[in-house]
Amino acid sequence: MTRLITGTFLLLGLLGLPSVAETAKGLVFHDLNDNRRFDPDEKGLAGILVSNGTEVVPTDGEGKWSLPVGDDDILFVIKPSGWRVPLNDHRIPQNYYIHRPTGSPKVEAESIEPTGSLPESIDFPLYPQEEPETFSTVFFADTQARGIREVNFVIRDAVEELIGSDIAFGVSLGDIVADDPALFDPINAAIAQIGVPWYNAFGNHDNNKDVAGDRPSHTTFEKTYGPSTYAFEYAKVAFIALDNIVFKEEGGHDTRIRDRDLLFVKSYLQHVPKDRLVVLFMHAPLRSCGQVEKLLDLLSPFPHTFSVAGHWHRQNHFFLGEDFGWTGKDKHHHFVNGTVSGSWWCGLQDELGIPHAVMNDGVPNGYSFIDFDGVDYQIRYKACRRPADYQMNIYVPMDIPLPEAATTEVLVNVFNGSERSKVEISFDDRCDWTPLEQTRDIDPECLRMHELSPYLDQEVLGAPLEDVLGWKMDFPSRTGHMWKGFPPKDLTPGSHIIRVRHIDPFGPDYEDQRIIRVHP
């Protein structure tokens, strides 16, 4: 252990990270009576992983561990498969100890009070639980609530329909709030009603804006959720939460993976068997993230990997190869999840006063169920308050003159489509399915909604219509989950059914239909 700690001192110094001054010690144990204290009749657990945020060590045969710790570190146990950790009233894992002897900088939202000297022993309780290899999870991106009104949008639009769902746990991919960490408490209380453990990633709108620099900006997030980079295991899946939002002293932020977080990933992966699925989740997509090459180099030896991000308020699938540092088999699948807040809660309000919030790529606001079966996974995107099979929009005029029928474009926005999707079209009761051509285009309905902006600038009774009816939509973004094609040349006058099906290698297959009228 002396050599290991000395090596850690040298490495942290080379990285420009704070040097360590103390050694923390503790125990991981089976808490038989659920009192979160180690009692004489309870036993320590061997081989459980504990971390200080950079180094990961297993407990010894008696469940004991020791790690170097600085004066601004968080120590945590990595939940192993088949065990659970304590939760607080908001169902947030309580598997960590914050070591901040003098406390955090004072911030407007909740600060971290001085923790004082290290305890003699920092003990982490665990509890056994069954974890079948087949399980479901739910991933939220960017709930991004501005004020309690938008917290209520999250509740009405997403949380209420998830209560009682058969899921193992949930994840928020950052931007939990919109620049107001004081809202963590009400939004956590709401999400807790879903009834499952909930893990959280740090987003660029989850920071404390009243302090400068990277570490101080994380104050209320860490007070509320614990470490922003961490890991846990469930069944045959190793999950890694990665904080890739770095706040600068002069203001603003970068999307970059810190050296210390790369150290953590490297150290943790040394303990992960190669037959496991490794899933990373984070806020900013890896395509726009500094040091992604180093991260993917660490992941490349693992045959089963997958990652999820939010941030863009668009839905995308990327397959990252050598250009991003990936040297493994096939390419790394990186999924950019659609957001609960959609287009930042913009758009006309519906009959319940909730904005439609369609994203700028035409995907409705929503969240994803990600189902796991051993090392396999599938993604089921769910539009908020819409049927589960609402998976595409088919754009075509309803009334088409017969001479124009064969040249009238059918445009399909497949919400969860990717370059590996197969999208096909058929008409009426014909048995033949014709492939559609993938294209990059803007969503026609998004464009129409954007063109309402001048009307929303008008005032009625002294109030802008935008404040009364809903916020204006941005100009739509061009997206690649669009497909196009044309009707057959032999359509006759009358009503016809257009059928479109999406064969998805990463999720269930879906079919939808539209009716058109062809007239002489």
Identify the residue ranges that each predicted region occupies.
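N-terminal active-site segment of His-dependent metallophosphoesterases
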Residues: 104-185, 488, 520
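Short, acidic Ser/Thr/Gly-rich low-complexity loop/linker segments typical of extracellular
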Residues: 38, 44, 54-68
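Binuclear metal-dependent phosphoesterase catalytic core
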Residues: 327-417, 421-424, 486-490, 496-513, ...
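Acidic, glycine-anchored loop motifs typical of Ca2+
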Residues: 32-42, 412
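Extended active-site neighborhood of metal-dependent phosphoesterases/phosphodiesterases
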Residues: 94-103, 108-114, 181-274, 291-308, ...
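A short, solvent-exposed loop/turn motif at the edges and junctions
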Residues: 52, 74-110
